[in-house]
Each structure stands twice: as C-alpha cells, then as structure tokens.
C-alpha cells in the first residue's frame, strides 16, 4: 500500500477492502496468508474496521487475520467479528514496554499468537538503560549479548510468543536467531522479571 492511501480514511471498511485487494495484487498472490489491521483509526469505530477485515477473509483475499496495537477490549471486539480466523496479536513488548502484559496473558489463555514488535525496546532514552542491567548481568555470565538474553526472556513467556527484532547488520540478525537456543534458568528468569 502506498503511503498516500494510508493517510486518509484508512480505517473505513471500504478502504481496507480496497487496500487489501491492492496488497494481494502487489504481492502477486491470490490470497494473503496473514493480514494485519495495524492501527486503529480514531475516526472509525473499531468494530467497523474489523468488519472490513472480515470481508477480505470472506472474499478469500486473506486466509487469516491479525490485529496490532490493541487493548484487550479491542481484541475482544476483533475476536467477536473475526472468530477463529483471528490468529495473531502484534503489540509492543519489551523490558521498557511491559504495559501490554495483560494482552500477552490474554493471548495465552485464548490460544492466540502474540507477536512482539520492538522487543529490544526500540528507541531508548538514556534513563531507560538501567532496565537492561539485569539482562546485561545474565549475558555477561552466559557469554552472550544482552540482546540475545532479552529475546530469550521474551520467548520464555510461552509457545504463543514470537519476536520480530529489527536489525541492520548480518551478525545482529544471526545473534537474534540464536535467542531461541538460549534456555534461561528459573533463577535467571526470576532475576529478569
């Protein structure tokens, strides 16, 4: 979707349907595997935006749906409208951003994937750096990067947890991939919580 399409009226069902079809065409696919409703348009009731996504599912433009940046209240609305086609929630979560813990827990209860964006905290203010000190301590003991420890801690939250860290260098990508192999002890997890 071009940015000019997303600036105005992006949450209206008719626009979401149009954008979804254009996205499938641009990707060269008949059907998008997982289509996210990324941001709530404050000018459009959330249930109406979800109805637009449902129409795309019903038309076969998408197979599965996800929602992003949602509260539990919005998630419940999406569940009601999208039913079992809703499979994923993508919210920010990191040692700095723990305010979506309730949504993370709710996803575990509901069998929904929780896709954690900005799992390393994204842009950080210097006054947030102390929040990573316990991760640095565990990393030093283990001989790995603290970023790998952060990702391993997040992945330890459950099988429903997925992380999507950003990276610019190949070695950073490879380090992030190894987080799945790092099994933290109960003592380490307690220290990080």
Residue ranges and their predicted role:
Residues 1, 18, 48-51:
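Alpha-helical macromolecular-interaction surfaces
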Residues 22, 31, 52-56:
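Structural preference for long, well-ordered alpha-helical segments within the folded cores
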